């Protein structure tokens, strides 16, 4: 259950928006008030400052594992209500946990600049403080029961509290003329998490991301159009294998002889959490299309395209056991047609 109130104030050069959102999470029996602020100030006719800040909350956690080299699919779970009672921050200070919600504080500041009639620049910097996050507990080695009640929560809880930060800059440059558009988008960000034991980089901590898009139109009524899109993403973190071991089962209990057993199964010995990086991702796609007016109110569109023009091997999946890599789409031509009437 949620509701919000918003008030927008417009002056000669300033737009100010104040809002208050309220969320009631029935599964946890918690209410979360979230004030937010946004503004835009026209410094000149061509240059505008803007910013926003606010409190945010959510009750969903991703059901993926850090033990996978690459996560192919993401599921989501409702946040648990049996979290630890106390959390130790990076400075060694212990604080009591009074809420089961995930909470964050966001701040954004930037500007918009109309450099010329054809060129626009948009630059934003942001910082996000994750005051409280919930994650699956990779440090669990004991059951959470009465027999283990004196053990630390970090060794027995299914889910644990984490904190973290994310900082970054987003830059967008647009160049638009009558027949062609060119877009350049660049993002830099750094994210880290503290789980009460260690600081680590989350699996989505991609330092650099870039998109270059170019579109050109020509012919009668601009019926021809071609475009290129190139995307680059720097390497994502993963937890490497440190080694392998055989799982001795001790099926005969204390009377078994482990020196003569020959187990059929092996297990992975993992290295430091997300301490390695995959290869960089980049890909070029090209497309050309022609719009044909068959008759009044009827048009046909023919598309020819190539995905991954230079056949880059981008990682899709890596097997933990064999280290075999599966790659994403190879060079892939396509042909399509649509009829609109």
Each PLM stretch: what is its role?
Residues 1-26, 30-36, 171-190:
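Surface-exposed extracellular loop regions of Gram-negative outer-membrane beta-barrel proteins
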Residues 3-9, 37-41, 99, 109-113, ...:
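Residues on the lipid-exposed face of transmembrane beta-strands in outer-membrane beta-barrel proteins
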Residues 13-16, 46-49, 118-121, 179-183, ...:
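Repeated loop/turn-to-beta-strand initiation elements of outer-membrane beta-barrel proteins
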Residues 231-264, 277-285, 289-341:
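C-terminal beta-signal and adjacent terminal beta-strands/loops
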